[in-house]
């Protein structure tokens, strides 16, 4: 072999490395970008195939053309096994095709179609499973909503007769027993559980009403307004106006109640006292009597000191006389006792 043939042997080795690596013509600012995933795009044969076909150096025979595809030259004008078949198929491809499609190869076409059909079936299975799951969830939600709607009860509308009977029973006892509830159920023609719920709501309403005014009826009874009423002091106008306007639920019934309220009784007593002449006469008589009593007590208090001194002196003299009398009486008692001893 000559030196020229050795040089030709070395040329394909140098030119084959960039073809299987990164194609410099396809590099840009963003990096490596390929037009497709065909074999010609991966090997970089498409960009060099078109100028070779249109160039004047194309040989008359097909072997020379296939041997010089893409500017590559092989020893003896022959291609390796497999590469010649791919290059011949690439040479038969029309020049305007953007990429090498697998449909041009009859052996790969059946494989790609079968693979594509398998992917479609898998996607359909996935979508069908998702649809089933979503459908099951929707069915579960609908069933849960239907159960919630079934559990909801309708509000019981009480008649005036039923409310009257229930209020009477509540005034008698806030916590009726089973027997009382059954009797109410017979009178009102209501179920026993409905009556129990009504009493629970009525007790809550009663507690709320009791706590509205003064925070508690007991506290209000011993509070400021209760003391004012007990001492006949007029209440504020806001409290009285609230009772007159019909807001009896906002105040304690014992304070401003119409039948027997403390405020009403105290106001009646105050009105009667200044109007009757007997009361005025009795008041003046009591005042005069009190003045006389005070004068007599003052004078008696002044004379009381002298009387106490005289009484002290008299008491001392009487005590001395009593001591003397006891001393005089004691000797004969002793004699009598001695005589009794001798006789014994």
Curated annotation (Swiss-Prot):
InterPro entries: CVC, HD, Homeobox_CS, Homeobox_domain, Homeodomain-like_sf. Keywords: Developmental protein, DNA-binding, Homeobox, Nucleus, Sensory transduction, Transcription, Transcription regulation, Vision. One of its GO terms (cellular component) is nucleus. One of its GO terms (biological process) is prechordal plate formation. It comes from the Eukaryota. SMART domains: HOX (SM00389). Residues 280-295 have a biased composition (Basic and acidic residues). The keyword Calcium does not apply. It holds the Pfam family Homeodomain. Highly expressed in the central and outer tiers of the inner nuclear layer of the retina. It is found in: Nucleus. Residues 37-44 are annotated as: Octapeptide motif. Residues 49-70, 127-156, 273-344 are annotated as: Disordered. Residues 147-156 have a biased composition (Basic residues). Residues 211-268 form the CVC domain. A motif (Nuclear localization signal) lies at residues 147-151. GO terms for molecular function: chromatin binding; DNA-binding transcription factor activity, RNA polymerase II-specific; transcription cis-regulatory region binding. Residues 151-210 bind DNA. May be involved in maintenance as well as cellular differentiation of retinal interneurons, such as bipolar cells. May play a role in establishing interneuronal cell classes in nonsensory as well as sensory systems. Belongs to the paired homeobox family. Interacts with UBE2I. This is Visual system homeobox 1. It comes from Danio rerio (Zebrafish). The lineage of its organism: Eukaryota, Metazoa, Chordata, Craniata, Vertebrata. The gene is vsx1.
